[in-house]
Amino acid sequence: MERNKFASKMSQHYTKTICIAVVLVAVLFSLSSAAAAGSGAAVSVQLEALLEFKNGVADDPLGVLAGWRVGKSGDGAVRGGALPRHCNWTGVACDGAGQVTSIQLPESKLRGALSPFLGNISTLQVIDLTSNAFAGGIPPQLGRLGELEQLVVSSNYFAGGIPSSLCNCSAMWALALNVNNLTGAIPSCIGDLSNLEIFEAYLNNLDGELPPSMAKLKGIMVVDLSCNQLSGSIPPEIGDLSNLQILQLYENRFSGHIPRELGRCKNLTLLNIFSNGFTGEIPGELGELTNLEVMRLYKNALTSEIPRSLRRCVSLLNLDLSMNQLAGPIPPELGELPSLQRLSLHANRLAGTVPASLTNLVNLTILELSENHLSGPLPASIGSLRNLRRLIVQNNSLSGQIPASISNCTQLANASMSFNLFSGPLPAGLGRLQSLMFLSLGQNSLAGDIPDDLFDCGQLQKLDLSENSFTGGLSRLVGQLGNLTVLQLQGNALSGEIPEEIGNMTKLISLKLGRNRFAGHVPASISNMSSLQLLDLGHNRLDGVFPAEVFELRQLTILGAGSNRFAGPIPDAVANLRSLSFLDLSSNMLNGTVPAALGRLDQLLTLDLSHNRLAGAIPGAVIASMSNVQMYLNLSNNAFTGAIPAEIGGLVMVQTIDLSNNQLSGGVPATLAGCKNLYSLDLSGNSLTGELPANLFPQLDLLTTLNISGNDLDGEIPADIAALKHIQTLDVSRNAFAGAIPPALANLTALRSLNLSSNTFEGPVPDGGVFRNLTMSSLQGNAGLCGGKLLAPCHGHAAGKKRVFSRTGLVILVVLIALSTLLLLMVATILLVSYRRYRRKRRAADIAGDSPEAAVVVPELRRFSYGQLAAATNSFDQGNVIGSSNLSTVYKGVLAGDADGGMVVAVKRLNLEQFPSKSDKCFLTELATLSRLRHKNLARVVGYAWEAGKIKALVLDYMVNGDLDGAIHGGAAAPPPAPSRWTVRERLRVCVSVAHGLVYLHSGYDFPVVHCDVKPSNVLLDGDWEARVSDFGTARMLGVHLPAAANAAAQSTATSSAFRGTVGYMAPEFAYMRTVSTKVDVFSFGVLAMELFTGRRPTGTIEEDGVPLTLQQLVDNAVSRGLDGVHAVLDPRMKVATEADLSTAADVLAVALSCAAFEPADRPDMGAVLSSLLKMSKLVGED
């Protein structure tokens, strides 16, 4: 019974268990079916999102998305355990359940917009679209991706702001937005990304301050926000980021002090905050960063001394504190940094001596101490730095002998010690420096012979021993320097003959031997220097017939051989020097006539044949072919006869003509009226006859000096001489002029010196003006003159007021005449000295094959057809032209097609005559370079067109606010700016933006890119009035950047002469000898800044007190008179609200003047200019 009861209970229990099991199975089956259905739905959503992503891609040149397609039955849920087909698509990865976790398509050249549907793929963990061409905004819908860990969209064209919705991606640990066009502030909620370890957004247009919430990113390891427009200070809370390893904030607008709290970031290895506006001291607490390897604080406004506590940064490899305002001594404690490889302290105000302890830095490879106030000798133990490769100490007051131990620095490649007070002989043993490539010791007091072992440095490329007191001869061993490109020995006391072996230096580009005591003949071997561009032999004792071998140097642009003893005629072979822009053969004993061959030098800007024994007529055909002469034509002090050729009027750009002291006859040619840019004309000491041409003077209204004395000219002085409003010196003495002295001369307010003596003038001497202080010597020899204190009263005329002729007036007159004469004599010398530095040889692209198109591919840029651009510009209709030059015409265009969405562009169609087929290699090669130049202050190149013999064109972003020229001066091409655009702040902002762009061109790429034509019309203004430098590739496409030899081989005559820059903005060395360096752009930038703040063009007529001035002279005079003087020359449309505004404007003009210095060596680099401008921005609140 009991057993039956037990059995019955067990039976009931089992029945219940079975029922429960059946129910559980049913429930599980139901849940499984629901999960399967849910999974299928999720897959469907993700598939749709992927297809929408593909639809947003307008161009897929590599076909990476070609396999992103759905079969006939679709790609639905998981079937039979297999993953959905889209999990195998290129760049897509899924988890085991078929959910998309990753989209990675870096460097795929995709172009289009990023689809917001990606926000529907809730399982996404990684998005990597690095180095594509996505544009438009970053979709805010990405903020729905709660599992997203990495968002990497670097190197695209994304615009707009950083969506604040991204702060919802709580799993995010890597956010990389660098190299885009993002604007606006960093979202204030960025601190909500508590897992963030890497935050990169460099090279954008972000502004505003660092959000305080960043202090909550306790796990952050990398912060790189460099190259933006961020402002404000670094918050002290940054010291709470204990895991921070890399902090890069360089090239922004940060200001204030560097926070001491940074010293608490013990894991910091890289600190780059250069090129900002930080002020105050370098915190001593930075010495606590014992793991720090790189500290670069240069280009700020830091003051006080270098903290000695930096001795504790024992891991430092690179310490760069240059280009600040640091004072005091160099701390000896820096010698305790055992790992230091680079120490850069240049361009500060450091004083005292160079500490001997620095020679303990045995790993040091770079030591830069230039442009300070250092004195005393270099440490005798400098030779301990056996790994040193660069020793840069120029522009100090270092003295004593160069230490002998320097010969132990056998790795030394660059030793720049010029502009110091070093004395004594060069040390022995320099020949051991077999790695030495640049040795610059110019402008010191070194003496003795040049040691022979110096010529064992076979790797030398530049040797500058100029402006010292070296004596003795130039050794024949100089021929061992086969790699030398620049040899500067001018300004010494070297003697003897120039050795024949000098011809072994076949790579030489610049040879300066002027102002020595070299004698004898120029060696014939000089013809081997086929790359030579500059040859200075002036002011020596060289003799004999001018060597024909010189005229085999077909790359020469400057030839200075004046003040020697050369004899004989000028050879016809001079015609071989087709690139010559400067020719000085003055003060020799040359005879014969002017050869017709001179007429073939169509690039000539300056010609000086004065003080020789040349005779015969001045050939009109030669003069007619010299239409490019811009600066100086001097044929004075020879024996030329005959008439002044009428063709002289074709020299429309010449500024000085001197034909004095010859035997010229006939009249003054009326065609001189064509020389509309003439400042000085000297025809004195000839046998010219007849009257002065009618209507001559109104055409020469820029003249400041006119000397026609010592001729046989007669008739009356024309009344229209009153048109010479700028004349300062006028000498008509020793002629046969008659009649009355024109009363209008008294009204020429600029006139300071007047000589009317030895003529037959009659009647009263005018009152006023220059006549108030005129001396008797300026009037004597005119028996018919009357009036005044020293002359008999005039009969029939009212006696004028008595005048006192003082000795002071005579002294002033003599001084003025002397200064005018000295000015003429100095012109040639100034032009020669101006070329101290020359462009270093640049590698020209060596493109193999006959087809440039096949040789160079520019995948980064879109290629357009002729038809596409014709459709965009209405067949290049003139109504669409927004700019033109001899090199190109720019059209406004609208791209057709759905992909372009009516995108407005600027189409720059190049002139095929100036860009012939021979320039195709340069054109296509430089397109590849342009495609990689990406900066917020450079005009973006969208694409290009190239069809042989049909079109060469660049397609650029269209800028709605036109160019800076239109904004300054007005014009149809640019809308008028709002009144606020004319404040000091806004103009300074433009300068900063242009400087940013040029700094990037000069130092942001593998090699410096020199613009060569910086001017307001090449600065474009976008919708926010942000300045963008354009046209930075034209010079390179014409091969202007190439070494002369390569350029000659690659370019036609049309190409080599087409790109001339723009008059008024060209640096002298570029105008005269086509030398290309970054200092060319610095000069142009200085002129641009002056034009921007004064509203005056550099090519316009500028007067001050009736005296003609260049824009630089006007600004220089104004700055020298202080703030009142500056205020007088500022653009009246510019609002100057406060004294701080005026002071800032004065500071900008002072920087601009330094940029426009005549000597390239005297100009700052664009980095230093930008640093100065950023410091000024703070004063006007431009943060």
Curated annotation (Swiss-Prot):
Enzyme class per UniProt: transferase
Protein keywords: ATP-binding, Cell membrane, Disulfide bond, Glycoprotein, Kinase, Leucine-rich repeat, Membrane, Nucleotide-binding, Plant defense, Receptor, Repeat, Serine/threonine-protein kinase, Signal, Transferase, Transmembrane, Transmembrane helix
Inducing or repressing factors: Induced by flagellin (flg22).
Annotated signal peptide: 1-41
Catalytic activity: L-seryl-[protein] + ATP = O-phospho-L-seryl-[protein] + ADP + H(+); L-threonyl-[protein] + ATP = O-phospho-L-threonyl-[protein] + ADP + H(+)
Subcellular location: Cell membrane
Protein name, entry field: LRR receptor-like serine/threonine-protein kinase FLS2
Organism: Oryza sativa subsp. japonica
Biological classification of the source: Eukaryota, Viridiplantae, Streptophyta, Embryophyta, Tracheophyta
